[in-house]
Design a protein with these regions (language model features):
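His/Met- and acidic-residue-enriched segments that coordinate or traffic transition-metal cofactors
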Residues: 1-61
Length: 61
């Protein structure tokens, strides 16, 4: 396992926060969308950012 520096951990924390916020925003927008195609696109974007979050989180273990 690679040991991360304090700077790397700080950057990772910032990226995790950003991705988490994007997931929440796109899920909220998807819930409010009336057009099915827009709703699907927004849900897809939320899933993409959730994947980014999961990938970054996996770097912590």
């Amino acid at each position: 396992m690679t040991v991360l520096t304090e700077k790397e951990l700080s950057t990772l924390k910032d990226l995790l926060s950003s991705e988490e916020l994007l997931v929440k925003k796109f899920k909220m927008l998807a819930e409010q969308a009336e057009k099915p195609e827009l709703k699907n696109q927004l849900e897809s974007i939320a899933k993409k950012h959730q994947g980014h979050f999961n990938e970054l989180y996996s770097k912590l273990s």
